[in-house]
Amino acid sequence: MSKRLRVEDDFNPVYPYGYARNQNIPFLTPPFVSSDGFQNFPPGVLSLKLADPIAIVNGNVSLKVGGGLTLQDGTGKLTVNADPPLQLTNNKLGIALDAPFDVIDNKLTLLAGHGLSIITKETSTLPGLRNTLVVLTGKGIGTESTDNGGTVCVRVGEGGGLSFNNDGDLVAFNKKEDKRTLWTTPDTSPNCKIDQDKDSKLTLVLTKCGSQILANVSLIVVDGKYKIINNNTQPALKGFTIKLLFDENGVLMESSNLGKSYWNFRNENSIMSTAYEKAIGFMPNLVAYPKPTAGSKKYARDIVYGNIYLGGKPDQPVTIKTTFNQETGCEYSITFDFSWAKTYVNVEFETTSFTFSYIAQE
């Protein structure tokens, strides 16, 4: 004989099998549905849990697609938009390479040919060059930095006679930058002090010829007591001295009789606008013409004698004595002693040119 289970009239036979009085109990997910991927939202509705890039579009599960991705019509495949040099090969995104690029050890690199190299920590310790592409240079070629970046340049040795002209051509002689000639310019403007400032024009040209210096000198006195020689009224005036003193770099010193601003490398018929910083190659050789020391022997070769003529007249001679490295307070020196034995009356001191040579320091 069977029995019937007695239940209350308000029992709800639909899961969760509650009673009418339990209406505040939230709707529960049926026990046969996993909570992984499902949710009870809104209450009483079984729905999917969605996380980006999954979305519901027009009631369908869809995929949010950003830039660079596309869903193909018809096939529904998700593909990558590849613009050159990117490309799809065998369902893989890659990069199209052309010389000089390559992939080595799974890394994009640059193929460097002859004369080029990629500097690494194994090849150089200079931090400024590491991981950069550089030009390998040999003798005579170098690099330098400019406002527009690095440049490859030809290395021109100082004092070698080579330079670049205004067109950028390498020349052995540049009339606008003649560093084979130190001079005072050929004009007659005063540049020297004998007795008073700018009382004379000393014309001196030093031209480097290998190990020798070819020199030419002349003098015009334009003011002061030596302008007109009159030994009847000034019998004691029988000579004077002009000294050129140079420092260890061959730069003319302020204590010289010749004005420093009038002495420089040649630029056509003038001098270069920028003062020179080094001219040792024009200096008298310290071995051939040693500086005087206690007990040292003085040789006749240290002196160059010659005759110049006042007003260009052969009967008005003046002796010019040139000595080298005999002055103190300097590294190098050239000294000109002008003297005359003849009695001159109202003769203007304007000399002919005198040419001589001496052994160069370099």
From Swiss-Prot:
Localization per Swiss-Prot or TrEMBL: Virion; Host nucleus
Alphabetized Pfam families for the sequence: Adeno_knob
Cysteines engaged in disulfide bonds, as pairs: none
Keywords: Capsid protein, Host nucleus, Host-virus interaction, Late protein, Viral attachment to host adhesion receptor, Viral attachment to host cell, Virion, Virus entry into host cell
Main location: virion
Superkingdom assignment: Viruses
A Gene Ontology term for the protein's cellular component: viral capsid
Biological processes per GO annotation: adhesion receptor-mediated virion attachment to host cell; cell adhesion; symbiont entry into host cell
InterPro entries per record: Adeno_fibre, Adeno_fibre_knob, Adenovirus_pIV-like_att, Attachment_protein_shaft_sf
Presence of keyword Transport: no
Functional summary from the UniProt entry: Forms spikes that protrude from each vertex of the icosahedral capsid. Interacts with host receptor CXCAR to provide virion initial attachment to target cell. Fiber proteins are shed during virus entry, when virus is still at the cell surface.
Note: All late proteins expressed from the major late promoter are produced by alternative splicing and alternative polyadenylation of the same gene giving rise to non-overlapping ORFs. A leader sequence is present in the N-terminus of all these mRNAs and is recognized by the viral shutoff protein to provide expression although conventional translation via ribosome scanning from the cap has been shut off in the host cell.
Subunit structure: Homotrimer. Interacts with host receptor CXCAR. Interacts (via N-terminal tail region) with pentons.
Free-text comment about domains: The tail region anchors the fiber to penton base capsomers, whereas the shaft, built from several repeated motifs, allows the knob to protrude from the virion.
Name by which UniProt lists this protein: Fiber protein
